[in-house]
Design a protein with these regions (language model features):
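A conserved active-site cap/scaffold subdomain adjacent to cofactor or substrate pockets
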Residues: 165-189
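Glycine-rich phosphate-binding loops at beta-strand->alpha-helix junctions
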Residues: 13-14, 95-96, 195-198, 261-285
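A short acidic Gly-Thr/Ser loop motif
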Residues: 13-15, 140-147, 153-154, 165-169, ...
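Alpha-helix capping/termination and helix-coil
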Residues: 179, 183, 197, 241-260, ...
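Nucleotide/phosphate-binding catalytic cleft detector across ATP-hydrolyzing
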Residues: 1-140, 157-159, 182-184, 188-234, ...
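Feature representing long, continuous alpha-helical segments
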Residues: 173, 232, 236, 240-247, ...
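Catalytic phosphate/nucleotide-handling subdomain of diverse soluble enzymes
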Residues: 278-305, 310-311, 318-323
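Residue-level signature of catalytic and energy-coupling elements of molecular machines
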Residues: 11, 107, 142, 175, ...
Length: 359
């Protein structure tokens, strides 16, 4: 499609099979007469990684939270410091071994080398969170079709990860049942509603009073439904499901033990982020600041790709940019990546390219 052959890739994974824990590692500095080296860092992280784990689980990520040198805590980078004893607090993400093997098999069949697995919530974090939010404490909520991936950052470090088996597809199902239409029609209605209502300028209640009926005649649905009541659609169908979603998110935040450490609130991203009533309902249930997260950390992308549904995909590219160097340059300027798309229909091709990677 783009004229580029894919030989390797970073793969995002998420869903209920994801779990996490925090671990502590301790080692003696290899040469106390010299500074702490990168080798010392690797050894202490490996010590933290040495946890008792079932054969059905596999570690996919180990993120250092902070280092402790001779009892001095709160160190973000210990390289170059002097000390005898080096410790580290880490956050470890694990996944189902079976699920990972099945994914590996697919990539092997395609002739694509899997560079690494990355939790999709962490990938989205790379694309939409600011360093300030991470330092203050923030919750990243990636709402996909059938799952919600959650990452909590405290003091600049990933400290908790989980996945909730609930997502935007459940809202679509509710609309299909409530309006007695097919799932395809329900999805079209949901997306159409999201485009019609600007969540950042007025609440859904205000809009519903001004425009009580939503005209969906232009969608040309097979059920021949021309309009629906906004009150029924928003208050009767969508809002109850959103309340349930945010109650699960709230319970997960409380379960993490970091509920009092996230003053930056929630950043909602993913394909379900623009669902009508998302911000209003979230603020009511969670009681914290909430914003919609879009991937704005890259240059050269057309506006259609600066969208919450592409956060995880953009995050994977940014993650790869940190780990792979092509020549002497990274991938910060995406104009060169897209230059081989033909002018005619390039926008559609680009959008379809990204949609291949959306779960």
């Amino acid at each position: 499609m783009s004229g580029h052959k894919i030989t390797s890739a970073y793969v995002s994974v998420g869903g209920p099979h994801i779990s996490s824990l925090n671990s502590h590692g301790i080692v003696a500095v290899s040469n106390p007469q010299s500074d702490i080296s990168e080798d010392d860092i690797d050894r202490v992280v490996e010590a933290a990684r040495a946890i008792s784990l079932s054969t059905t689980r596999q570690i996919i990520d180990v993120s250092p939270r902070d280092y402790i040198v001779d009892g001095q805590a709160g160190i973000k980078n210990a390289i170059g410091m002097s000390g005898v004893r080096l410790e580290v607090d880490t956050h470890i993400i694990t996944a189902s071994t079976t699920n990972l093997k099945n994914i590996e098999r697919v990539f092997d069949d395609l002739g694509i080398k899997n560079q690494d697995f990355i939790f999709s919530g962490k990938a989205s974090s790379e694309a939409v969170l600011t360093d300030t939010e991470k330092e203050l404490g923030v919750v990243l909520v990636d709402i996909g079709g059938g799952k919600i991936d959650l990452c909590i950052y405290v003091d600049g470090a990933l400290s908790y990860s989980s996945s909730i088996p609930l997502g935007a597809r459940h809202i679509t199902n509710d609309i299909a049942v409530g309006l007695r239409v097919s799932l395809d029609s329900a999805e079209k209605i949901k997306l159409h509603l999201g485009k019609k209502i600007n969540l950042n300028t007025a609440g859904t209640g205000v809009i519903a009073k001004k425009t009580p009926q939503l005209n969906i005649n232009e969608l040309d649905l097979p059920e021949n439904v021309n309009e629906v009541s906004l009150k029924t659609l928003v208050d009767g169908i969508i809002s109850p499901r959103l309340e349930e979603i945010f109650k699960f998110i709230f319970e997960e935040i409380e379960k993490s033990g970091f509920g009092q450490s996230v003053p930056s609130g929630l950043v909602i991203t993913g394909g379900g982020a623009l669902t009508v009533g998302m911000l209003e309902t979230g603020k009511q249930v969670i009681g914290l600041p909430i914003r919609i997260g879009v991937p704005e950390k890259v240059t050269g992308l057309i506006d259609e790709i600066i969208d919450p549904q592409y956060s995880s995909t953009i995050g994977l590219i940014l993650y790869g940019d940190k780990n792979i160097i092509v020549g002497d340059k990274g991938f910060k300027n995406f104009n060169k990546i897209w230059k081989d798309f033909s002018i005619g229909g390039s926008m559609g091709k680009l959008k379809n390219f990204f949609k291949q990677f959306i779960p």
